[in-house]
Amino acid sequence: VLSLGFKQTEVFFNTSSELEEPFVKQLRKNADDHGAKVLSVHPFSSALESNCIFAEYERRYDDFIGLYQKHFHAAALLGAKNVVIHGSVAVQKRNMSEEFYFDRFASLVELGKKEGVNVCQENVVRFRSQSVDFLKRMRDYLGDDFHMVFDVKQAIRCGYDPFYVADEFKNEITHIHLSDNTPEVDCMPPGRGTFDFKRLFQMMNDADYKGGYVIEIYSKGYDVMNELAFSKQYLDSIKL
């Protein structure tokens, strides 16, 4: 990614050993050497959040929360301001109340503040955050502590017009995952579909958006390096 000239990136950690300081500091050096900035961190443990953070078994929460403290510390070392959280699935075996969910999320927010990072709710299909109404209630509950990662493809998968979601949360969005689409395909490299990126950039500029944009697509079936190079050139040509 850095070799292609990208100046903004997200680090997706893949295992706990990558959270150790020597590894994280090497990542930071790699970014600095290329004049790039790490905007965000994505935990590898997103699939476990339902059972280990947003569930009532306290001992499991106590044992697991340290992993997120390490992610927040790693984000701080990288200079990243955002940590991406999926949260709980939409239907849990033991469904917790929204207030319980919001309180647990608030506990993550407080840990993030100690490292100077925003703990952000991403909109994700099949998770509670797939619902705009849920996100509105979360915003009301958390107030100024509510920060959001907006994902274009996830908005589509949740059944929404991405521009509706972006407009509703434009003042709370601190980070954006970009992808292209067509009526038939919901996730494509930017420039390969019909999504109106210029409209999105204009909307966020008008809202005085200070966050960044990263491309998030799934690599299966793509010549990744060539597609990223193409998408970078395409997006650079239309950014306002």
Question: Which residue ranges define each predicted feature?
Answer:
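N-terminal pre-domain/capping segments
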Residues: 1-76, 113, 144-147, 171, ...
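Short acidic/polar active-site loop segments enriched in Thr and Asp
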Residues: 7, 37, 81, 174, ...
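Acidic/histidine-rich catalytic cores of soluble enzymes
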Residues: 8-9, 41, 107-197
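Acidic-and-aromatic substrate-binding clefts and catalytic sites of carbohydrate-active enzymes
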Residues: 12-26, 90-96, 126-131, 152-160, ...
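Charged helix-capping and loop-helix junction motifs
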Residues: 22-26, 61, 65-68, 97-106, ...
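Conserved radical SAM core fold
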Residues: 45-50, 90-92, 180-185
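Active-site acidic/histidine proton-transfer and metal-coordination neighborhood
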Residues: 50-147
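Short acidic/histidine-rich active-site segments
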Residues: 212-217
